[in-house]
Amino acid sequence: MAEISLTFPDGAIKKFDEGIKPIGVAESISKSLAKKSVSGKINGSYIGMNDVITESGDFQLITTSDSEALDLLRHSASHLLAQALKRIPKFANIHFGVGPFIENGFYYDTDNGAGNQVSIEDFPEIEAIMHKIVKEDLPILSREITRDEALEIFADDPYKVELVNDLPVDEKITIAVQGDHIELDKGGLVPSTGWIKHFKLTSVAGAYWRGDSSNPMMQRVYGTAFWKAADVEAEIARREEAKERDHRVIGRDLDLFFTSQEVGSGLPVWLPNGATIRRQVERYITDKELSNGYQHVYTPVLSNLNLYKTSGHWDHYREDMFPPMDMGDGEFLELRPMNCPSHIMVFNHKPRSYRELPMRIAELGMMHRYEKSGALTGLSRVREMTLNDGHTFVEPEKLEEEFKSILTMMMGVYRDFNIKDYRFRLSYRDPKNTEKYFDDDEMWEKSQKQLKTAMDDLGLDYFEAEGEAAFYGPKLDVQTKTALGNEETLSTIQLDFLLPERFDLKYIGRDGLDNHRPVMLHRGIVGTMERFTAYLIEMYKGAFPTWLSPLQVQIIPVNLGAHGNYANAVQQKLQDAGLRANVETKDAKMGYLIREAQTNKIPYTLVLGDSEVNSNTVTVRKYGDTKTVTMSYDEFQYLILSDVSNYSRETE
């Protein structure tokens, strides 16, 4: 009998009879390995545990201990969901789009016709049938078929037919079969439905087919799955917490912002409370940058299209830009998608000397991005945004020093906002594919070493990501997890060798020659005001630290007639001290007014009655506390001003 040769991750090479399956390979090693093996991998492609290995090559067994096994479980759970739906009479003719795994779960896009779509109310019935199919322990097998066979199998499902027709002519087409259910699938599934024991359907949302608003709207059914029931329960609890932190919900409840189709999709309107938070952030970051040697500028939100042709944005970023405006005189103006070309113009508008370097330019610059409507979300994904942007033009030999300076400032900002959960990622070019990057090997090697040395000198932990650098230079990303569990980039320091060349930037060097080229560093400390505010809303759960809170003090007179004048006097003193205070004038019970102040997450509530008026004191209740403390007005003012000046951190 012919043999195949399999090379294992440890380098070992073993021969097996032709017709061997991954389960047989696993059993030849140990029964315990076979029991926990989810899938095989041959030459980088998944192969089911019960499918025949048809070629020699690199082989790997994926077990439940491997992180990617969870992806396979969730992918399989989406198929389980589809099979269960087809068994429910009212969904017997349902059409399916795609059903991938995603971070923390899975989804399947479905279309059952207008007025009869899948809803949350259907979940108990769907889950019951899913559990029944799990007990049936149906084997999941892959099979290669022809294009004609695929079109015949999925003839009644227009979305699957479209997917088949879009496949390249020479591409292999495979299906996954579990009982009476067939999926168009490339592999990466558990051995049988019996493996998918612990899952939960979580939500339903509308989603355009293939993310295109010109296509039909489908129902996207979301779920999650884990190897252990406890992990499912923990994930559901995390999601419930995430709902409570959702910046869109809190933004509505606390009157921070709103969005409206009448105004336009992706164009949030900042209400007074939200505008106050944003103003505090803007003032803070501007002052921080000024104190670190930055020069703040204002540059136009519109620029000549040629500026973006020179920068390369028009060639590589056009689909994310709004169409140019024809001014009728040969000039085309463009809503800027980025601020860097404008800052380059600031540097380049007159001759520069090394004595002016590093030149640090910063701006709260408004930008516009042509985002599809399906991608828009509250403040975190918008079409108009204001970026805390900065660019430094530096001598190449001073790069490491400037990098440290920016990074030190970043960490000071995180400290003031009480941001603790973040990690550093250094992104390098791919050493095996250098032709993808700006062509200057010496500059790449030197700059990557400088960034690494700077991180080491500062004693910071980081991980390195080869191949993740931009075309024009290495970078540092600061990664964080939002309260909703999504990883996003909080800050970036990006080295750029390309734009100084494209715009022919030069400065007069120490040798008196004017042919020296600066290195450009792009950096964003807090990103856009929109996304950063969304992040803060969710991180603080709407209970902002005193220095950021829209209203810092709510003053409640026990009787407006008897104590109103004193309340107004206290308010005036607080406002004179630069604080934001309000006197409650509603005619309601004291308990209700105090609860309302707590619901609105106001840091300090003052209750003023006869005793306080007569003794020139205030009775103070901090947000989240049940106890009150009576103190002199001067003591309270000192307390709250100390709180504000210390960014509401615990005294160190």
UniProtKB/Swiss-Prot annotation:
Co-factor: note: Binds 1 zinc ion per subunit.
Residues that, per the record, bind Zn(2+): C340, H391, H522
One Pfam family from the record: tRNA_SAD
PROSITE patterns registered for this protein in UniProt: AA_TRNA_LIGASE_II, TGS
Keyword tags: Aminoacyl-tRNA synthetase, ATP-binding, Cytoplasm, Ligase, Metal-binding, Nucleotide-binding, Protein biosynthesis, RNA-binding, tRNA-binding, Zinc
Family assignment from sequence similarity: Belongs to the class-II aminoacyl-tRNA synthetase family.
Main location: cytoplasm
CC annotations in GO: cytoplasm
Reactions that this protein is recorded to catalyse: tRNA(Thr) + L-threonine + ATP = L-threonyl-tRNA(Thr) + AMP + diphosphate + H(+)
Molecular function terms from GO: ATP binding; catalytic activity, acting on a protein; metal ion binding; threonine-tRNA ligase activity; transferase activity; tRNA binding
Biological source species: Leuconostoc mesenteroides subsp. mesenteroides (strain ATCC 8293 / DSM 20343 / BCRC 11652 / CCM 1803 / JCM 6124 / NCDO 523 / NBRC 100496 / NCIMB 8023 / NCTC 12954 / NRRL B-1118 / 37Y)
Protein's name in the database: Threonine--tRNA ligase
Cross-referenced CDD domains: TGS_ThrRS (cd01667), ThrRS_anticodon (cd00860), ThrRS_core (cd00771)
Record text on subunit structure and interactions: Homodimer.
The keyword Iron belongs to this UniProt entry's keyword annotation: no
